[in-house]
Amino acid sequence: MTIINHTLGFPRVGLRRELKKAQESYWAGNSTREELLAVGRELRARHWDQQKQAGIDLLPVGDFAWYDHVLTTSLLLGNVPQRHQNNDGSVDIDTLFRIGRGRAPTGEPAAAAEMTKWFNTNYHYMVPEFVKGQQFKLTWTQLLEEVDEALALGHKVKPVLLGPITYLWLGKVKGEQFDRLSLLNDILPVYQQVLAELAKRGIEWVQIDEPALVLELPQAWLNAYKPAYDALQGQVKLLLTTYFEGVTPNLDTITALPVQGLHVDLVHGKDDVAELHKRLPSDWLLSAGLINGRNVWRADLTEKYAQIKDIVGKRDLWVASSCSLLHSPIDLSVETRLDAEVKSWFAFALQKCHELALLRDALNSGDTAALAEWSAPIQARRHSTRVHNPAVEKRLAAITAQDSQRANVYEVRAEAQRARFKLPAWPTTTIGSFPQTTEIRTLRLDFKKGNLDANNYRTGIAEHIKQAIVEQERLGLDVLVHGEAERNDMVEYFGEHLDGFVFTQNGWVQSYGSRCVKPPIVIGDVSRPAPITVEWAKYAQSLTDKPVKGMLTGPVTILCWSFPREDVSRETIAKQIALALRDEVADLEAAGIGIIQIDEPALREGLPLRRSDWDAYLQWGVEAFRINAAVAKDDTQIHTHMCYCEFNDIMDSIAALDADVITIETSRSDMELLESFEEFDYPNEIGPGVYDIHSPNVPSVEWIEALLKKAAKRIPAERLWVNPDCGLKTRGWPETRAALANMVQAAQNLRRG
């Protein structure tokens, strides 16, 4: 019973973000489709080879995607919304891009599909759309082509396929309502066809991802697994793959399935290995997800070995990453600016492959010397002064209930704010960022590289802020922003100015499509050595008589969009960040900034996957926000922003944030999200996003007016704000000006009645 290792997937963007650059070049019309496809082939070949060189036995194929893997699955099944279809019914890569972006180099523009978070990660997928009587057929053979590529290169491969029930679970019904689970029998023949094609190619194992099995699924969905997998059995061996949580609550459903193996996440789940071994059929393979695919920390391999060693030799066993390595940066070895001590604490995707090789070798030989050597830096870290700050720990321990309460209730504050700002009905604003032009990015890069001194850099940034203020005044917006020219990323910027964080040069991970983020890493206790945003906010406010919002990223979002420490709770990290940013709110207020936005787009995505675990998380998440904001005076208006969210199940907590104004992303869901606020009778002010900033399409005045009228049927007009869905950082100035001009015009039309 020789143990082998495998990964569930590998980062696809490339070490230098080659995929992003190729996509954006193609979208802009600067390269051909053939050139784009060639970059994909080159990256796949490189990544398979890198994994093999790092000691991986069985390589994942089908984990590559041109936008996201759920969208790839939609195309595989022929699930293309009517508005995105080619006239001749064919499907090509531009079809895929139209679903993701709303437009592509060919075909007519049409509203992009809805985008949402992949379980509780920072990765996104395009939500599959289902209509009554829908037909499915094998349409997009990317998976089969990539398997052929890998086999031609001589690799031992394991195709990766998103399972049918998880796929249906992730989608939404459009038009006439029906139970989307009823489509299961319609999509299974396509899965059967794909598995038959893989069998023809001599494939032994297929990784079929069913992460929905870690959720608290309705009984009807659990019941659907047995007949579905009865239909899929027999052509190849199926490794039923779960991740992000444990499977014990649904183990009875799982063990009844006609599959040949089960992958479990032993990092994020609480499954007991001995219990799993006892309950799984004896002829099943167990794939043990021991190496964290979602973080950057070096694994304590001695501990991982102890976790699994008792079942070695008792059943077929593979060792693996907990989930796809998609969520981790690619290679630590190219990081030249991290000091040796801190660098020794980390492992990126390729190093995690090496960890899997070390673990496999030790489990096969019984020799653990290499594991102890690998794990030594982890022991040293526990006592490092880089990690522990007694002053922060003391301040955290001294928090009282009073620290999370504003001085007065919303009604009292709203009156003070109305008297101070005298805003018109339907006040217009934006979410914070303006287009990050090539000039802005070059300016920041030159400064970072030392090619530009601090004075010239500051002059340049001041000029861009001035331009943003001039543009907004010209457009007639009511509440302005400084545009965030100095910020590369809403989380990275704050991390760079807080103690307790470190940064990488090339630690990119994919968020969606071509968007990549470089998350900060929380290595120790968090504190604020000096004001962060005050100087630029104060400068922007000096340029105009209109209020300029101070812009902060909230504590839960900084936590969720960073790689967190693993030695303290997420609650502890969030509250440390909240205390640091509380001081920033006080300093902004003292500098004359009267409106302060604390963005919490990640509040909902941080929810545990199981509803039974929600309350504890929401309690400390809300408390962290309130600690951050509660220092503000009555006439200081606190805004918050949230995106990609479904709120109906957490409305109590949204209201408990007690922000004076909340702006939300609603345009892609056609104001659907406002139902939650209406039913809950949300007491404070709200700005439902009136156009989708993820698409370059410019909305008409009529379209925006119609959305606002729809919103006013649910929320009293006197409590409505008018704003885009999200920040405008990724857009160009021409479409930004056009869209905002239409938005302001729509608000003015409504004021006139």
Swiss-Prot record:
The active site is at H694. This is 5-methyltetrahydropteroyltriglutamate--homocysteine methyltransferase. It is an enzyme of class 2 (transferase). The keyword Amino-acid biosynthesis applies. Keywords: Amino-acid biosynthesis, Metal-binding, Methionine biosynthesis, Methyltransferase, Repeat, Transferase, Zinc. It comes from Escherichia coli O1:K1 / APEC. 5-methyltetrahydropteroyltri-L-glutamate binds at R17, E18, L19, K20, K117, R515, C516, W561, E605. GO terms for biological process: methionine biosynthetic process; methylation. Binds 1 zinc ion per subunit.
